[in-house]
């Protein structure tokens, strides 16, 4: 019973204090990680000992194997695991008995000793001294074989990380990828900037916003759905290359590829267009894959994906027409609606914009390899510049990989008159019941009136990108603390929380 275990461990904490042992000390001098130990001493031969090489490391005890007056145990830190060996004859009977009685899987300890290779060839730390650094009050799940219940893993990600090395590795890759993206853009002289998360007008994307209230000004505010309009204000103000990595919020559904709270990167470059942003996208992502895996190829859900540039380009109008026999520019609304109904799709509204988006949804999953979907109609692209060869289209693209939209990019609309008319068209959609339609932002129009240079803009969903990079089937697998429904915490019975 969990209550009995919690009670026993609480008792052990009190016993340690009575023995003069602080179960939660302040500091430990760590000279090596498990990774540096492995790198420096892996070449040792079985049975070889380096008594003069003192090392101090620390981590969580994962396994303990007692053998009378000696013990093998494994500790885990952020970088991996290392075996350790402790003997009564080395550290004194009193301290060895303390280890035997009070050190258990889950505890965090520091050890000092020297490296050797066991007869079976496993690199091991011979412990000359140890210190308890944090006494675990809860047992590791399922005797350390890992946390297998997905919902529990999402709610208690800290336990998931402890129990499953693959989870820790997944998030290590996530933050290594984000670091690479920053370094890549910084080398190209992009400047990382910040924009507000609280907005008076939720702009920059077609989505239903979260609403909050600012008591100081007695007014409603919105969590941002995208930083786009503020980033373009930076370009108006004189910045030429900017990016922001941050959280966005959309009060919409949850699915394997949708989270109401998600991370994106948005990038804007003055004097560039969507062709430049395509080159930037395929260069950034392909070099990221190469950096992580040493190859442009990786396997996602059993399918090999090849990220080597140049990626394939397809045009939205032609692709939909080839698959569904409908022309999203020439055919009337009735034809679009008929094609959707014929395939069992009921649009939320009969607006042309929504029907075009639903038609694309029908064929998106056919696009597996890294591909740029290009030249969307003006109807569904209110912030993109009209196409230089066909004003019914826009200079817009979306990178599509494994049937998922990974981002969105434009030659940015910088004509204030055209932008004002697009906002007005969006207002009509809102009046007709479309909660996701863009709102009027007159200050943004004013910014454009001061002059936005020709600009290329790009947004990439970081979470979906990490799904691909870590072969994760759900977006919740790559968000450390995803949104999950709340439950009663009955398992806190018997703990300090009670």
Curated annotation (Swiss-Prot):
GO cellular component, one term: cytosol
Co-factor binding comment: Binds 3 Mg(2+) ions per subunit.
Database matches in SUPFAM superfamilies: Class II aaRS and biotin synthetases, Nucleic acid-binding proteins
UniProt keyword annotations, A-Z: Aminoacyl-tRNA synthetase, ATP-binding, Cytoplasm, Ligase, Magnesium, Metal-binding, Nucleotide-binding, Protein biosynthesis
Chemical reaction(s) catalysed: tRNA(Lys) + L-lysine + ATP = L-lysyl-tRNA(Lys) + AMP + diphosphate
Main location: cytoplasm
Keyword Cytoplasm: yes
Annotated Mg(2+) 1 binding sites: 398, 405
Positions annotated to bind Mg(2+) 2: 405
Coiled-coil residue windows: none
GO molecular function: ATP binding; lysine-tRNA ligase activity; magnesium ion binding; tRNA binding
Electron transport among keywords: no
GO BP terms in the entry: lysyl-tRNA aminoacylation
Required cofactor names: Mg(2+)
Family in the record: Belongs to the class-II aminoacyl-tRNA synthetase family.
Subunit structure: Homodimer.
Name of the molecule in the record: Lysine--tRNA ligase
Originating organism: Pseudothermotoga lettingae (strain ATCC BAA-301 / DSM 14385 / NBRC 107922 / TMO)
Lineage, highest ranks first: Bacteria, Thermotogati, Thermotogota, Thermotogae, Thermotogales
